[in-house]
Amino acid sequence: YQTICSRLLAKSGFYQSGGAYGFRDQLQDSYGTKFLDIGILYNQIIKHSKHQFIEGDVEHWWHDENNRGIRTKFSDDLLWLPYMVAKYIKHTGNYEILNVVTPYLNGAKLQENEKEKYEQYLPSNVEENIYEHCKRAINRACGISDKDWSFGEHGLPKIGIGDWNDGFSNIGPEGKGESVWLGFFLYEILK
């Protein structure tokens, strides 16, 4: 009840009261409702797929009222979509979610010197199924579709401007920081 009311509906936490949809937050929180109503997770997956750019990255957070959000170089956000799709399929045995078609967002890629950009992002004319959305996220995270999102000198994924541990934000904006946590997370998704 608390997760549904305070996190999914109110979009608020003790330290976050801006009312935005957080990409990773909403997906994580909706997974906690899987035994109560798996439809909540299904709906969040579909909703979040519409906040992915064609390059595979996603809005870190957004407001539905004005279609404004923030495009960032956080390294983990984009992987929450394939992770939760895999969890949904494992829990339900229903692969049909992979066939649902949704649009990507339009938006200029961040420049090398940009860490984030807040602006209005609207749906593009490019639509693909959830399976392709997941592939784009994984390819981006592995550096297949964008060399800036690759692995560092120790063979670990680059952290970008942060990973799941927000306390490590901005330790790798020059492309040198790596994330052990992200390595484990990516491995979990790929297996």
Protein language model annotation of sequence segments:
Residues 1-191:
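Acidic, mature catalytic/reactive cores of soluble proteins
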